[in-house]
Design a protein with these regions (language model features):
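Sec/Tat signal peptide C-region and signal peptidase I cleavage site
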Residues: 4-9
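Compositionally biased alpha-helical segments
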Residues: 10-66
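A composition-driven surface/loop motif
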Residues: 65-179
């Protein structure tokens, strides 16, 4: 009973995937979790149920709800903690490029740390947000280090005591799109 009470005291279940992406799901919308044929099915109220193969999941943990998304850049891979994965913030990673699409109504904080020699942070957002640079060094040889596709207010915070370096390419690659 103590274990059950501990889980109920938490607000989110975090799925730590083997690709270094962590997704959080509100326990209030989690109907059930089923293990079937080497896959894990998460059944959410009023949403399509995501399916993960057992090899995709590194671990599960429980914690508080947060409006902070953490992105750790590294030339060996990008680590992402997205507690809002099922609430309107989708994140994809393509090589060193992190692309975020946010439709959530709350003000989200994106915290960038680490170093990448060829990457980018790109965000499409319907609402204002906070971008915190916490010792980040992003170099993008063929485009911007940070690409903000939002007409809303962006607050940029620089964490005290850190050095942040953003290096854009000398010549941008032609993407054929608005950004």
């Amino acid at each position: 009973a103590l274990c059950i009470q501990s889980i109920l005291a938490q607000e989110k279940m975090f799925v730590h995937r083997s690709d270094k992406i962590t997704q959080g799901v509100l326990l209030s919308v989690l109907d059930s979790m089923t293990f079937v044929n080497e896959a894990v099915l998460l059944h959410l109220h009023d949403q399509d149920a995501p399916t993960y193969s057992m090899t995709e999941i590194d671990s599960l943990s429980f914690g508080d709800n947060s409006l902070q998304i953490k992105i750790l850049y590294s030339d060996t891979g990008i680590e992402i903690v997205n507690p809002l994965a099922f609430e309107g913030v989708s994140i994809s990673v393509d090589d060193g490029n992190v692309i975020i699409t946010s439709t959530i109504s709350e003000e989200v904080e994106y915290i960038l740390t680490g170093t990448i020699s060829n990457g980018m942070f790109k965000i499409y957002s319907d609402k204002k947000f906070i971008l915190t640079l916490n010792g980040v060094n992003i170099t993008n040889a063929d485009g911007p280090a940070i690409n903000i596709q939002s007409g809303k207010k962006v607050t940029v915070n620089l964490t005290e005591g850190t050095i942040n370096t953003l290096t854009d390419g000398k010549k941008y690659a032609d993407s054929g799109s608005e950004d």
